[in-house]
């Protein structure tokens, strides 16, 4: 029966005939014997699971079932309320549950294993292929979830997404972010400051800098024709006063702060609150200095950003403050480095750059990432380009019984997937791949909130 957008299937209630548990070389197996087919559902959380089936179990069946701790199974308990039977288990946090059914006789099989990923290769929509598989690096198999998309297809488009259209500051779960922007598929994007929730890297949309690049880090750029470009990106910006004095701008709409000038436009939000103590904020409207505002203690004073202008947050830079009295006319200049990025209206920053022209070029130090970041093993997100120019978005999770990949292992995986160019995105607890309403690579309860992402959109 179809109810709204839901297909509702109703079966006659079944009966549980027996419950069996047996340790295996790869983990644990629980088998439920049924009198006839039954609908069943699985809910997973880190370290536990719940299987609910439409069918009763007699007290004698439940009392005779005494599951002992197994390889990955710590506890197992079954209850029945006369209409449904519920099986709850406590398992190793590294384990996952794979649910399957068998006929003749009717059975439900619950496998608890570290390598529970079911390989898939599905053409999900014209120009969109979903894969999940194990990819081995140095003998270690990593679970890899990927979506390959041909952006040259007229029904597909890619764009940056962030927490709210009215501000670039803030964090939210990727599922919420994707639903808010109505993206069919999404992956978490660039880095951000988890304390103040400000972006730390490039986001450009429709030729407008939502947030500027920092530290010469890697980025992906694209256009409406589906062309993709990867490289390390810097932004050279300066302002020139009416009397010829010139000052560099460090960053645009960014949580990355240092001595000098930070530029904040209306894209940042309605107001700017100083990030550091004792900033002097220069208010500019119609390319003319309107006033100076003392920022005071960081995080306290909200300063309005003119809709026809911007703010210059000066930090330990009295020379610039003195050269910008009210009434001063200002001209701004902007150029990307390399200039190849200039041709692309859409950009998302991340880093480090992993692969360029089929060669692993990973250099965390070049992009000013810490040594600890460069060597740690963690879940990862990445974006790449295949030899035939298709976009590939990828997440890689913990290997069975172990940790996630290092950056070097991630670069190797991207090459094995066929990428000629690839970029690391924010990872760890941020690493999330949203696909048609759910996360492919992890339980949503384990996914951290993020500042931004990449959304793939399908035209109706």
Q: Each PLM stretch: what is its role?
A:
Residues 3-56, 62-460:
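Gly/Ser/Thr/Pro-rich low-complexity, intrinsically disordered segments
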